C-alpha cells in the first residue's frame, strides 16, 4: 500500500540528471520516472537579455483612472534592450509515459491554489430561462414565437444551457415532427421513407441532439428523441443488464469507425442517467458487466470454449468461471492472436452557438468498447501490427528495462509512494486520492488535462501484474468499477461536466510487467487545447499535490 511520505527533497535531488549527447543523438528515455523510485522534476528560472529591434514608438492613451489621470502605454515601448532577471519558476515535468509529452506548471498561478486548494473548482451555472425574461417584457402569446425564431446560434446556446423545461419543449417541437396523443403527449417521432430507408423528420439534427442531451428536458421527450431503442438507428441490441432500478442495453455498432465493430452500453429509457450524481454503484456494475462479458465471450469463442448461453446475461459466478477457463486455455496452448481490449467513456455533451460540437457523447452516460486484433492486412499484401494505445506502454516497458535495467511500474509505484512536493515546499506531499488492496486512484505527477486522474491496478495474479481485464479476478474488477465511479464523482464534485475516460491495456498472452491503467481527462472551459497541447506541452496552474487535496476533499 502506498503511504503519504514527507521525505526530504534532498532525496529527490539525488536523482541523476538526464544524460544527453546531442552530437551522437544518444538521449536517455524521456520519462520522469527513475530507477531510484523518484520523479525527475525540472525548474526554469532564467535570466536573459532581449535585443530591442523596434524602429517606431506608438505611444497613446489607454484611458483614465478615477481621478482622470491618464493611463498610457509607454511601458510597451522601452528605449533600450530588455533584461529579465530570474523569471518566476516554471516547473517542467516529463510525463511518466513519454508518448504523452511534458507538463509545465506556472509557479505564480499555482501559488494561490497551494495556499487554498479549494480554489480548484468550477462554479455550477445558475438557472437560465429566456422565457422568464421575455415574460417581463412581452405578451405571453408572443414569447414562444420569439424563442423558436431566434437566430440559430442563439437557439443552439439556449438548447445547451436552458434550465426551463417549457422552453426546451418549445425548441424540441420546433425542430422535429412528433406523434402526439389527443391530449398532446408526445409518444414518438414522425418518419419519412425513401428507397426503403426510414428517417425521422428532423429539421436540424444538431439542435435536436443538443436539446435531447439537456438534462432539464422532460423525460418523455428524452425517451422519444434519444433514448428509445431504434431512435438513433438500427444497431442491434445483443446484451442487457437489468437489476433493481438499473437497466442497460448493449448495442452492436457493426459498421463502425472501429474495425471489427464496437459495442455501446447505453442506459434504457427506464433508467435515465444524465448526470454523475444519478449514477449508483449498481449502474457502474451493470455498465462494466456488459464490457467484461462481451470481452470474455469473444475471447472464449476464439479459443473454442465459448459457453452455449444465449438470450440471457452471464451471472457474476459464470463470468468468473469463464475467465478462469480462458486463462487455463491460454496457459496450455497459447495459439490465439494477441488481442487487446479497447474501452472508453465520453461523459457529457455541449454544443456552442458557433456550431462547434464540444464533446462526443450523444447520450449523457454510455460506455463503448471493442477488441483490437493483433494484425492488420497491408494494402501491398503483407501484414502490419494493429494499433492499440496499450502497446505504447508495452514499448515503453521494454525501452525502460533496456535503458535502466529496471521495471517501469515497480519504479513508478515507488515514485508515487515517495513523492515530494513539486515546489519543494512543506505542504501536502501525496498524489494518492483513494485506494484499496487492488487499485490506486491518483493524480499524475504530470497531468495532460488540468484535472486528470488515473486509476492503476496494483494487484497481481498468478502470472504477474494484472495488465488487462482477462487477468483481473472478480475482486479486482469490483475495485476497478468502484475506482471509476469515484473518479467521476470527484471530478463532477469539482464542477467538471465533460470527461473523456480511456483504458491502456496489455495484449493477451504477453508477460511484460504491464499494469492495467485508466486515465480520466476532463475538458475545462479555459483549457480546450491549442498549439501547446498539439506539441505535447501541457500548461497547468496548480501543483499536482494540491489537486490531490482538492480531490480527497470530495470523498468526505
Question: Where are the regions that the model predicts?
Answer:
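HIT superfamily nucleotide-processing domains
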Residues: 1-556
Amino acid at each position: 500500500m502506498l503511504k503519504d511520505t514527507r521525505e526530504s527533497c534532498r532525496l529527490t535531488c539525488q536523482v541523476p540528471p538526464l544524460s544527453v549527447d546531442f552530437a551522437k543523438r544518444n538521449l536517455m528515455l524521456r520519462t520522469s520516472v527513475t530507477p531510484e523510485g523518484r520523479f525527475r522534476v525540472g525548474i526554469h528560472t532564467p535570466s536573459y537579455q532581449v535585443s530591442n529591434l523596434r524602429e517606431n514608438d506608438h505611444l497613446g492613451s489607454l484611458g483614465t483612472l478615477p481621478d482622470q489621470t491618464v493611463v498610457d502605454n509607454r511601458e510597451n515601448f522601452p528605449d533600450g534592450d530588455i533584461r529579465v532577471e530570474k523569471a518566476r519558476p516554471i516547473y517542467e515535468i516529463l510525463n511518466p509515459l513519454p508518448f504523452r509529452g511534458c507538463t509545465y506548471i506556472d509557479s505564480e498561478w499555482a501559488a494561490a491554489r497551494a495556499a487554498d486548494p479549494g480554489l480548484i473548482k468550477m462554479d455550477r451555472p445558475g438557472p437560465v430561462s429566456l422565457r422568464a425574461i421575455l415574460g417581463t417584457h412581452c405578451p405571453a402569446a408572443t414569447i414562444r414565437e420569439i424563442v423558436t425564431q431566434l437566430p440559430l446560434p442563439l437557439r443552439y446556446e439556449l438548447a445547451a444551457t436552458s434550465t426551463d423545461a417549457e422552453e426546451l419543449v418549445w425548441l424540441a417541437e420546433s425542430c422535429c415532427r412528433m406523434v402526439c396523443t389527443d391530449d398532446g403527449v408526445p409518444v414518438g417521432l414522425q418518419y419519412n421513407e425513401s428507397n426503403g430507408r426510414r428517417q425521422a423528420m428532423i429539421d436540424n439534427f444538431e439542435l435536436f441532439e443538443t436539446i435531447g442531451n439537456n438534462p432539464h428536458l422532460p423525460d418523455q421527450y428524452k425517451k422519444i428523441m434519444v433514448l428509445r431503442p431504434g431512435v438513433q438507428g438500427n444497431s442491434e441490441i445483443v446484451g442487457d443488464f437489468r437489476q433493481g432500478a438499473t437497466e442497460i442495453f448493449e448495442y452492436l455498432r457493426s459498421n463502425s469507425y472501429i474495425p471489427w465493430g464496437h459495442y455501446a452500453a447505453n442506459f434504457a429509457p427506464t433508467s435515465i442517467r444524465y448526470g454523475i450524481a444519478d449514477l449508483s454503484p449498481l449502474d457502474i456494475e451493470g455498465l462494466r458487466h456488459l464490457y467484461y462479458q462481451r470481452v470474455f465471450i469473444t475471447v472464449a469463442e476464439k479459443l473454442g470454449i465459448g459457453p452455449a448461453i444465449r438470450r440471457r446475461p452471464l451471472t457474476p459466478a459464470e463470468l468468473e468461471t469463464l475467465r478462469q477457463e480462458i486463462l487455463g486455455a491460454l496457459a496450455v496452448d497459447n495459439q490465439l492472436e494477441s488481442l487487446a481490449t479497447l474501452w472508453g467513456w465520453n461523459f457529457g455533451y455541449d454544443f456552442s452557438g458557433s456550431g462547434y460540437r464540444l464533446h462526443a457523447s450523444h447520450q449523457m452516460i454510455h460506455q463503448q468498447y471493442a477488441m483490437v486484433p493483433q494484425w492488420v492486412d497491408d494494402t501491398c499484401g503483407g501484414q502490419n501490427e494493429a494499433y492499440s494505445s496499450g502497446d505504447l506502454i508495452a514499448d515503453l516497458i521494454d525501452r525502460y528495462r533496456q535503458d535502466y535495467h529496471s521495471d517501469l511500474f515497480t519504479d513508478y509505484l515507488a515514485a508515487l509512494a515517495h513523492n515530494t512536493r513539486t515546489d519543494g515546499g512543506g505542504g501536502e506531499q501525496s498524489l494518492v486520492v483513494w485506494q484499496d488492496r487492488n487499485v490506486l486512484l491518483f493524480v499524475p505527477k504530470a497531468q495532460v488535462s488540468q484535472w486528470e486522474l488515473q486509476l492503476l491496478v496494483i494487484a497481481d495474479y498468478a502470472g504477474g501484474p494484472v495488465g488487462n481485464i482477462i487477468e483481473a479476478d472478480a475482486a479486482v474488477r469490483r475495485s476497478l468499477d468502484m475506482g471509476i465511479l469515484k473518479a467521476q464523482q470527484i471530478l463532477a464534485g469539482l464542477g467538471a461536466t465533460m470527461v473523456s475516460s480511456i483504458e491502456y491495456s496489455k495484449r493477451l498472452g504477453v508477460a511484460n510487467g504491464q499494469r492495467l491503467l485508466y486515465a480520466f481527462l476532463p475538458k475545462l472551459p479555459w483549457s480546450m487545447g491549442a498549439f501547446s497541447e498539439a506539441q505535447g506541452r501541457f500548461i497547468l496552474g496548480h501543483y499536482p499535490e494540491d489537486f490531490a487535496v482538492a480531490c480527497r476533499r470530495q470523498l468526505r
